[in-house]
Amino acid sequence: MRLLLLAGLFLSVTALAQTPTPTPTPTPEEQYFEQPPEKPHLEFLWDALARYDSIYHLRVRPDIERGRFEVRPELDFVVSDRFKVGVRAVGDLGTDQNVNNGPNFDNYRSRGATVERYFVEGRPGQFVIDAGAFGMPLLASEMLWDHDIQTPGAAVSWEIPAGASTVTVTGAGFYGPQRQGDQTRIGAGQVVWRHGDPDRFQTEIAGSYWHFEPDDLKNTYFRQNYFTVDSQGQRHFISDFHEADLLLRLRFPIGHVPVLLSFDALKNYGTRGIAKDDADAFEGNVTIGRVGNPWDWRFFYTFQYVERDALMGAYNTDDWWFHTWYKGSRVGIALTVLPRLFVQGSVMFQKRLDLPTTLNRVMIDLVKMF
């Protein structure tokens, strides 16, 4: 063995002697160079939705069959990777009228166009600072917040490395997110812990507190929540809305297929009077697959149980029919037909907690993604 080692050493030395001296390999410090700063530029993005929507078994109303067409163009001025300014418009054309949106519990207007998003975003260091009207900066399920509703106000997030994990702390204040002159004030805080790689196994836990102060909210947005009516015909909530939310998400692949499991539990600590025992809500979701590239597919199943005053029904998803006071399931499957363009079909089964009848909603969507 010793002779073999000596022979190998001798051959190595001989080879080195016959080989021109190579250029020394730079150390990691010498290899490093800073990428040139990003030049200011404009970015144009847009998405669109074409939807067939059918709701039936409504008991006291005729069945509804309608179409919805929406486009959202966005223009961002990107100053650098740490600062940008943006504006986004939304245009809708539906087969129903705007007067139908209230009775149909919609968060959108069937016909019209408006500027819905205008924001300034800065990213100094580990912080993200948003001001204006922007997308929801906190992690929230559709049971709690409809992500098509923009959030006028300000938000600050701080990402803190913690070994193999990260902790993100967010504080935000919003003013009047709903349409028709809403002046509701909302304060929210959240802590998110993330660990792992979603391509292997990732855990995400988010705890948040939401404080709502309703003001000048139109009667149509009281929906299924408990309320009283004053002598002028204006509605007033019976409960306050001080909501604590705990969201758990698990991401992992099965083969090459991504899987998301999500569980959301919420409790309103502001219920009172006849609403005292109607304070809890839960959502469970499984999503398998993805969309975006041709022939990508995605399957999802969602279960929701929401008591009457567990949350404010003015701001959560309108893809279901009732906004609170129900339990139900929604299942759907999507297929990408062109880059960033997919078709999705879904069916929803929903029952109000005080009624035996289950209503159904079928939606077929053609979606162009940002």
Residue ranges and their predicted role:
Residues 18-129, 158-164, 196, 328-338, ...:
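Beta-barrel outer-membrane channel/assembly domains of diderm bacteria
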Residues 4-14:
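Bacterial N-terminal signal peptides
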Residues 49, 134, 172-176, 266-268, ...:
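Short strand-loop junctions, especially beta-strand C-caps/beta-turns
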Residues 65-212, 283-313:
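Outer membrane beta-barrel
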Residues 54-58, 100-103, 138-139, 173, ...:
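Extracytoplasmic loops and strand-loop junctions of Gram-negative outer membrane beta-barrel proteins
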Residues 198-328:
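Detector for outer-membrane/organellar transmembrane beta-barrel domains
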